[in-house]
């Protein structure tokens, strides 16, 4: 009986690992190879996302400062960039709570926020994420290779739902 239960658990894990949710989470820093030295290697060879790719810090075209507050808001809450530009985001947490800036499509951010809500605040590392402690500043370098409207959000449980979302317009 115990063997059957273990087999079912193992097979369930295999199914989840191959599911669309697992693939989406892998793109947002929760999948295999997203932590430690493996993460560094994966970032260098990471596929392009619909909203661009990790930028080269030596080739920054512009720096944009984003402030995050405990009012669950970003300032500015909208930025405009040129297609092809590499942007360094200087992300400052003016509050007493931890915050983060995660760049993605609205669907990705919503899916990731739901995952974090159901699994707890699972800190992760990814090229499109800047975690920032209270009264600290973080950095994120991103190249926007496609035109469109993309987003940044704080996916710490409760923050995204409270409206901690910003818009990136790429032309």
Regions found by a protein language model. Give the residues of each.
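Extracellular/periplasmic metallocenter environments
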Residues: 23-47, 73, 127-171
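Asparagine-centered strand-capping/turn motif at beta-strand->loop junctions
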Residues: 91-93
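N-terminal edge beta-strand
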Residues: 56-86
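Envelope-exposed proteins and targeting segments
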Residues: 60-64, 83-87, 97-99, 128, ...
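Bacterial N-terminal signal peptides
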Residues: 5-17
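Short aromatic-acidic-glycine turn motif
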Residues: 107-118
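Short beta-strand and strand-turn-strand segments in soluble, beta-rich domains
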Residues: 117-126
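Beta-strand signatures of extracellular beta-sandwich domains
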Residues: 100-104
């Amino acid at each position: 009986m115990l063997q059957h239960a273990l087999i079912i658990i193992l097979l369930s894990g295999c199914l989840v690992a191959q599911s669309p949710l697992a693939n989406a989470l892998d793109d947002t820093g929760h999948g295999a190879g997203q932590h430690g030295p493996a993460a560094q290697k994966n970032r260098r060879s990471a596929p392009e996302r619909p909203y661009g790719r990790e930028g080269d810090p030596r080739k920054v075209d512009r720096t944009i400062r984003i402030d995050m507050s405990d009012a669950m808001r970003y300032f500015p809450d909208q930025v405009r960039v040129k297609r092809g530009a590499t942007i360094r985001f200087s992300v400052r947490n003016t509050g007493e709570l931890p915050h983060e800036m995660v760049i993605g499509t609205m669907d990705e951010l919503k899916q990731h926020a739901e995952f974090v809500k159901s699994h707890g605040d699972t800190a992760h590392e990814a090229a499109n994420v800047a975690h920032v402690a209270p009264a600290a500043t973080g950095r994120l370098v991103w190249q926007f290779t496609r035109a469109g409207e993309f987003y940044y959000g704080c996916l710490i449980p409760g923050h995204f739902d409270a409206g901690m979302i910003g818009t990136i317009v790429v032309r």
